[in-house]
Amino acid sequence: KNISFVNIRVAHEIRGVADKILPELYKAGRFQNTLIVSPPGFGKTTLLRDLIRQLSDGNAYGPGLRVGVVDERSELAGSYRGRPQNDLGMRTDVLDACPKALGMLLLLRSMSPQVIAVDELGEEQDLRVLHMAASGGCSLLATVHGAGEEDAARRLGGEYMREMFARIVILIG
């Protein structure tokens, strides 16, 4: 077969990209379940990466939290030989190249995270495990593809999405 093009994406961190929205994600010093929505290429993963770091290290709005990250496609941590190449914070545990639903279950059962962070929700199985995590007192931080809240609601189930996420951040260009 002939190759018609090659697309190489290089994950990199941009520190401080979450600074402006961070205060909106807390209520009375507690991080609120947050969903980030945007079309591809708008910076969801970059924003997620910086939010994970700031939640883990602590910030002006709350103390550092234990964050569990399921990095299914190795985009968040950029792990190489088991070591994250991007800074996700000092209290972050990363499960690299692990399916989201399985990784979230492993984190819940063995790592006692205060926050679970995942990129690109979509599978029904992911949503079931997220619901289980939220029911167990774990905070959620996730992204989903969509042009806005309506698209995200169609993908995740509108009532379910609004019940699960107290904050919905929509990135527009």
Annotated model-derived regions:
Residues 56-107:
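P-loop NTPase switch/communication element
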Residues 47, 51:
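Hydrophobic positions on the alpha1 helix immediately C-terminal to the Walker A/P-loop
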Residues 44:
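Conserved lysine of the Walker
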Residues 111-173:
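Conserved P-loop NTPase nucleotide-binding/switch module
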Residues 36:
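Hydrophobic anchor at the beta1->P-loop junction of P-loop NTPases
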Residues 40-41:
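The conserved Walker
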Residues 1-33:
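P-loop NTP-binding catalytic core
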Residues 15, 19-20, 94-102, 121:
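A general structural motif
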